[in-house]
Amino acid sequence: MANPEGRAGVPRVSVKQGDRMDAQRQKSAVAWLSVISNTTLVAGKLIVGLSIGSVSVMSEAIHSGVDLLAAVIALFAVKTSNKRADDEHPFGHGKVENISGTVEALLIFLAAGWIVYEAIHKLLAPEPIGAAGWGVAVMFVSSVVNIGVSELLFKVGRETDSVALQADAWHLRTDVYTSAGVMVGLALILVGEQVLPGADLLWLDPVAAIAVALLIVRAAWKLTRESGRDLLDASLPPGEIAWIRERVSALTPIVRGFHHLRTRKAGAARFIEFHLVVDKDLTVERAHHLADSITRDLKAHLSEATVTIHVEPCDGSCRPACLEGCLLAAQEREAVRAHRSADTAAAPKA
């Protein structure tokens, strides 16, 4: 059967027990790093923003505050989603990560609204900015720190298939863009004071803040869409579904067909179920071993997969759903139907 490595949308290998523990430690470590870095940046931006009276720096402090809250939520989600399934949650706790991503997106929307409100207030009643150079410096440091931490979050988030970490990474990545925008706005004010002394350039600061808000609203919408998909039990990505079909189809002729393939995802966990059609003369024992073999194969390549297979006999009735996933050639189907008709005719009438 085809090897899924390198196929778009298909994880290379499943996570074994030892590797899962290492992955969990990695996830917790980078989540804690995000909390610590955001705490430091919030303090720095607040001090500088209040000192120089810059609404754009203050808006960035609020943005980093939201990032800090998101980082704490991500840390909670990472720890909770790793809990084993129990009687109350038989499918596990994976959706905690999806809920985390949705909440983080809503927090970004709220932060954007506050930034726009404050920026409009500053446009209508501008206030002088003192020591804009400090604002430029703190925005530069913020950008550098967030680039490093967000890259690490993206890396671990993709490797461990963590929705919460990737959502946290998007928070920090938007902070990079917004910090750069504020830095440019303050730098223009600094340069303008030297080149055009007396010119009114204070409007640049709130305009930069509004541009910041528009950028993070765009990121929030994308994050809401992505995290909401799994909450609504959307199917696995097309690449993964195509690979599952290819994997099962490769088992013909022992497998006559399959249908009613349904998939969904909760955090990093995948749930796959389908009806497997086999020869009607196959013993229950052999059919059971076949289903077990397919389950092991899918679990070996799809991370944290739970596979449910319903085995049914190929009796030649060829219902519409069965025909859709039939692996037999037309001639073979006719032979099965003929055999079924012969059996029916030979059966004693009641």
Regions found by a protein language model. Name each.
Residues 249-258, 300-305:
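Short secondary-structure junctions
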